[in-house]
A protein has these predicted regions:
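Glycine-rich dinucleotide-binding loop and its adjacent helix/turn
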Residues: 21-82, 109, 155-157, 161-172, ...
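Flexible, glycine-rich terminal cap/loop adjacent to redox cofactors
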Residues: 225-236, 241-335
Length: 335
């Protein structure tokens, strides 16, 4: 970046009234002894053969999705992280149910664990943590991504960066330079594709169409393509209770879908609605189970349009489906 209105790409200079930084993030490995033995999620696409055993470090969607992939292909999978449950930004019930379901598929979780070092033992990597040691054929650092802002000359033109290199912005995605904005993974926070898309759309609308357009993170549907999958839109129960103390009803159900009864599979589905009691506005929809991303995509329309619990109750159910449970929830489990 040459100045507040100009960037250089190779030998070409491009100028504009506004500049938007959307350079994403990159994988990183924690600075621990033996870190050169660790792979990142980028490296996994270049494996020449399926490892017999895999340890993944990280509680986020990348590590959990790859855990499901490797377990499904027959690898022995261990997932380690420092917290008690995965997906720290998700609803508490989602986190708990997903961990239980993944464990039922044979995935081992080591929680409350911090990595101390990695060592090579023959053709195995020994993982040393404060919770003990074990061996795996490969070790994957899936500890998130860091902003890909190094070497862009951002600070030289006055753009303020955070400790991890993230671009510091206000609620309108504006940086410390009036004509420069930033969206997506490079600003830190939630690193999911729908969030970056929503930020970009809101920014474009505000600059060129509607000056009052804003980014509404709670209307952004997201999915985690684990086994089973997660779909969510709106506020978590924890967020809703914090912003609406004493005014939240929670509707929740857990069941085994009909398609799993004949093959006698143990997999269950969890569905949850978070509702503001005073006006019956649905604040959040959450699901763990088969087809969760597909179902949540449709429910995101309802939340964006301001659907109430009465709207859900009036909606006829398509039977027999799993999705019908969202419109058949009648009694709150928490008031």
């Amino acid at each position: 970046m040459l100045d507040a209105h100009t960037v250089q790409v190779g030998e070409k200079k491009v100028s504009g009234k506004y500049l938007a930084i959307a350079v994403g993030g990159k994988s990183w490995v924690p600075d621990k002894p033996g870190k050169e033995l660790a792979l990142t999620s980028d490296d996994l696409f270049h494996l020449k053969q399926l490892p017999k055993s895999v340890t993944l470090m990280g509680s986020g969607y990348i590590g959990l999705e790859f855990a499901g992939i490797f377990a499904g292909l027959g690898s022995e999978v261990t997932v380690m992280f420092r917290s008690d449950l995965p997906l720290p930004e998700m609803d508490g019930d989602v986190r708990k149910v997903l961990k239980e379901q993944m464990e039922s598929r044979g995935i081992r979780f080591v929680t409350g664990a911090s990595l101390e070092k990695l060592t090579q033992t023959g053709d195995q990597i020994e993982v040393h943590t404060d919770q003990g040691s074990w061996k795996s054929e490969i070790f994957v650092a899936a500890t998130g991504r860091v902003p890909n802002t190094e070497g862009l000359g951002l600070q030289e033109v006055g753009v303020n960066l955070g400790e991890k290199g993230e671009v510091l912005t206000d609620e309108h995605c504006r940086t410390s330079v009036e004509s420069i904005f930033a969206v997506g993974d490079c600003v830190g926070g939630v690193q999911l594709t729908p969030y970056a898309i929503a930020q970009g759309r809101a920014l474009a609308a505000r600059l060129f169409q509607d000056p009052n357009a804003d980014f509404r993170p709670h209307h952004v549907p997201t999915a985690v393509f684990t086994q089973p999958a997660v779909g969510t839109v709106g506020l978590t129960q924890e967020q809703a209770e914090e912003s609406n103390p004493g005014d939240i009803d929670v509707y929740r159900t857990s069941f085994r879908p009909m398609k799993y009864t004949l093959p006698d599979k143990p997999e269950k589905v969890m569905m949850k609605l978070v509702v503001r009691r005073s006006n019956q506005l649905v604040l959040g929809c959450h699901m763990v189970g088969s087809d969760a991303p597909e179902i949540i995509q449709a429910l995101a329309v309802a939340l964006t349009c301001g659907a109430s619990k009465q709207d859900f109750d009036r909606t006829l159910a398509v039977h027999p489906t799993a999705a019908e449970e969202f419109v058949l929830l009648r009694d709150p489990v928490k008031s």
